[in-house]
Amino acid sequence: TVNVYGADWCGDCKRAKAALTQYGVAFVWHDIETEEGAEEKAIEISNQKHIPVVTFADNTFMVEPSATQIKAKLESLGILQ
């Protein structure tokens, strides 16, 4: 499962969600402004306060990834060809 921790006002978060949607990858959105514990979880994962934090099924994460970085990661996991 792909998880995205971010906020509606965050441009990088919108780009990450758009990239995942474009690639046809289902993800779970965690809004750090409204979901209890989401902000703390994002900080716990990345040890920083930057968003978005995107987590992947192989227990890795990316902070503020570009669409190209997301695509490369999905390809490395075999999710995209």
Regions found by a protein language model. Name each.
Residues 1-3, 26-28, 58-60:
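Short active-site oxyanion
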Residues 45-54:
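Structural micro-motif
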Residues 39-45, 74:
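Short amphipathic alpha-helix with an adjacent loop that forms part of the alpha/beta core around
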Residues 11, 36-37, 69:
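Short alpha-helical
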Residues 25-39:
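Thiol-based oxidoreductase modules, predominantly thioredoxin-like and allied folds used
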Residues 1-23:
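Local sequence-structure signature of Cys/Sec-based thiol-disulfide redox active-site neighborhoods
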Residues 56-81:
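Non-catalytic, surface beta->alpha helical segment in thiol-disulfide oxidoreductase systems
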